[in-house]
Amino acid sequence: MDFTNERRAMIDLLIRRGISDQRVLDAMAQTPRHVFVPAHERSHAYSDQALPIGEGQTISQPYMVALMIEALQLAPTDRVLEIGAGSGYAAAVLSRIVAKVHTIECREALAASAAALLRTLGYDNVTVHVGDGTQGLPDYAPFDAILVSAASPWVPAPLREQLASSGRLVIPVGGRQAQILLRLRRTGDTLRTERLCDVRFVPLIGGHAWTTEHYPER
């Protein structure tokens, strides 16, 4: 099935909703979202909605992916850490904008699937790691930008510590049902926080966020 028209309509919608960074728009226009969703969801792949991808997780709606990536204010030489690989879609979009993407997924099955798909599609500047995303990747730090694709009750300390000077971190922070999307920017030893918008994400599970005691089914 040819999704050219659907993908073009998605980009038009992003523009109408205020996404203006041409690099983000181009990256999303070039990334085949339909291959990152289950086969039975492909007819909805370019609609502006989150879709289930298994393991109780979702692929974020296109507008939210675009908004968060635009908020990172990326440069071509940036090294980016993504927390919550999911199906690998956001990492694929990021990889078209920056030099290197590291993405962490705590669910082994999702991580394996994302890694295989990204490798098959030729996203050679993306590395998928299995582990606790709230710990970050200290062996690869610092990062110019960190994108957290799941909601935390607070900003995990290891992620703050792994942010480079002048680095940006975008993360949903709040309770179980609703959160605020925050952007943190490091200047020397100072972190400045901006509130971007209200959001609702699946929970970030890990030692520095929600634990399995809060979400035992996960």
Curated annotation (Swiss-Prot):
Catalytic reactions on record: [protein]-L-isoaspartate + S-adenosyl-L-methionine = [protein]-L-isoaspartate alpha-methyl ester + S-adenosyl-L-homocysteine
Keywords carried by this UniProt record: Cytoplasm, Methyltransferase, S-adenosyl-L-methionine, Transferase
A GO biological-process term: protein modification process
S-adenosyl-L-methionine among keywords: yes
Active-site feature positions: S60
InterPro entries tied to this protein: PCMT, SAM-dependent_MTases_sf
Recorded superkingdom: Bacteria
GO molecular function: protein-L-isoaspartate (D-aspartate) O-methyltransferase activity
GO cellular component: cytoplasm
Transmembrane segments: none
Catalytic class of the enzyme: transferase
Matches recorded under PROSITE patterns: PCMT
Keyword Methyltransferase in record: yes
Pfam entry (one): PCMT
Compartments where found: Cytoplasm
Annotated family: Belongs to the methyltransferase superfamily. L-isoaspartyl/D-aspartyl protein methyltransferase family.
Protein role: Catalyzes the methyl esterification of L-isoaspartyl residues in peptides and proteins that result from spontaneous decomposition of normal L-aspartyl and L-asparaginyl residues. It plays a role in the repair and/or degradation of damaged proteins.
Protein name (record): Protein-L-isoaspartate O-methyltransferase
